[in-house]
A protein has these predicted regions:
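Hydrophobic helix-and-loop "lid/oligomerization" segment in the mid-to-C-terminal part
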Residues: 1-184, 251
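Mid-to-C-terminal polyanion-binding domains and interfaces
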Residues: 61-65, 71-105, 158-434
Length: 434
């Protein structure tokens, strides 16, 4: 309320330039619209602009600085997109990087003010601790983000002999080291993770299951009593289960999606930001589970409920089983000894090969996250088994595969004659240890 009714010229100008004039400023608006503009200039090394904006008593000066902050924030976003594209390319060229328990990715001259934000986004994509390192000649600086339950600072401190500076807390770290020590650092920090025990995955804490019939402005008004949200008081996340997908509408040049969903004749719309139709694997008619935030949306004087999708999965997906299977595959790739049940989870037979190959051929390949293939094949193959088959088919030149942060591109190649599936190196390796 104090921000909505502020008499500070800087905040007034920033509210106007953020498109919030005449609206009630919520903690969500502050977190995702106002604060990023203030933080952006600090990340770009121009923090004096934010200080001047907040201290000025002159509205004209505030309006000018606020406009600059919006431009700087757009520049920060462009820098982030550029680095994320480079990281996606690195992962596509060397997919084994993401088999590590702690993902360590490095690049040349990445802007050090944003690598922490980048680490957080890569962590969201893979559900693992991530450290992003920027090399500036012989010196490198890194920033990391962890998942709940894994003390990333302890892992970093265990590598102190390779570092020139380090600091942080269980969920975030910063560090410096000589560029030549990055490979040794990657190995050593993953040795720490290997000795840690079962690694936790990133997770979303659901406050409660929500009946879509109760999504209305009265609920939003009740939730507003818990604001402001932030550190120590996170925005509540609700679970919408067994929702039927009715329609998919691309927005903003296909950068975002509006989903129409229903259950028991109750229909709602939900926003899936930063996802295009090409990246969305689900089809109309499928039954989905969603983790969502709820907020008030004000537009042209109309007030409605905004449902924002944080994550989405098929209702028939056994997430724990899928993650355990992913761990089995990654441990196998890293040479870790597996027991017989874990190996059985990975070992395919000819029928398994045929099932996946027929699916890929009949659909002209595949262009979504590999994990969603489990659902597309009606849970007949485990995630680990799918990964083994894909790698075997790649080795035998049956397919080409490029796996990035958000999507996998699988293309079926022309084949002459019969192919001996048992000759694939990954199958031979599995047979040896089985």
């Amino acid at each position: 309320e104090s921000i909505t009714n502020t008499d500070r010229p800087g905040l007034q100008a920033l509210i106007k330039n953020s498109g919030l004039t005449g609206k009630t400023v919520s903690s969500t608006n502050v977190s995702f619209t106002i604060v990023p503009r203030i933080n952006a200039v600090g990340r770009l090394g121009l923090s004096e602009k934010s200080v001047s904006l907040l201290l000025t008593e002159d509205y004209d000066e505030a309006a000018e600085i606020s406009s600059q902050l919006c431009v700087d924030n757009s520049e920060r976003q462009e820098i982030e997109r550029d680095i994320l594209e480079k990281i996606d390319g690195i992962i596509r060229r060397k997919p084994s990087l993401v088999n590590d328990k702690i993902i360590v990715i490095d690049g040349e001259n990445w802007h050090q003010g944003v690598i922490g934000l980048i680490a957080a986004k890569v962590k969201e994509a893979y559900g693992k601790p991530v450290i992003v390192i920027s090399k500036l000649g012989d010196i490198a600086k890194g920033s990391g983000r962890s998942v709940e339950g894994f003390p990333l600072c302890d892992a970093v401190f265990a590598c102190s002999d390779l570092l020139t500076h380090r600091g942080g807390h269980p969920m975030a770290v910063g560090l410096s080291l000589d560029s030549e020590n990055i490979p040794a650092f990657r190995r050593k920090i993953n040795e720490f993770a290997d000795n840690f025990g079962k690694m936790p995955y990133d997770k979303i804490n659901i406050e409660c299951k929500l009946n879509p019939a109760y999504i209305n402005l009265d609920l939003i008004d009740s939730l507003s009593l818990m604001q402001p949200y932030g550190a120590g008081n996170p925005t509540p996340v609700f679970g919408l289960y067994n929702m039927t997908l009715k329609n998919i509408t691309p927005l903003s040049a296909n950068r975002h999606l509006r989903l129409t969903l229903s259950r028991n004749n109750i229909q709602i719309t939900a926003m899936k930001f930063f996802t295009s139709t090409e990246e969305f694997p689900y089809k109309i008619g499928e039954t989905l589970d969603l983790a969502v935030n709820l907020d008030r949306n004000e537009f042209n004087g109309n007030v409605s409920v905004s449902v924002i999708v944080k994550d989405i999965k098929s209702s028939d997906c056994d997430t724990e089983k899928l993650l355990d299977s992913r761990t089995n595959y990654e441990d196998f790739c890293r040479g870790k000894q597996l027991d017989r049940s874990q190996l059985s989870d990975l070992m395919p037979d000819r029928n398994d090969f045929a099932l996946l190959y027929r699916y890929l051929k009949s659909n002209g390949g595949y262009a979504f996250e590999t994990a969603t293939l489990v659902h597309m094949l009606d849970n007949r193959l485990s995630f680990g088994k799918i990964k083994v088959i894909l790698e075997a088919m790649r080795e035998l030149r049956l397919i080409e595969i490029s796996e990035g942060m958000k999507t996998s591109k699988i293309s079926v190649l022309p084949v002459n004659g019969r192919v001996d599936l048992e000759s694939a190196p990954i199958i031979k390796k599995l047979r040896e240890v089985f």
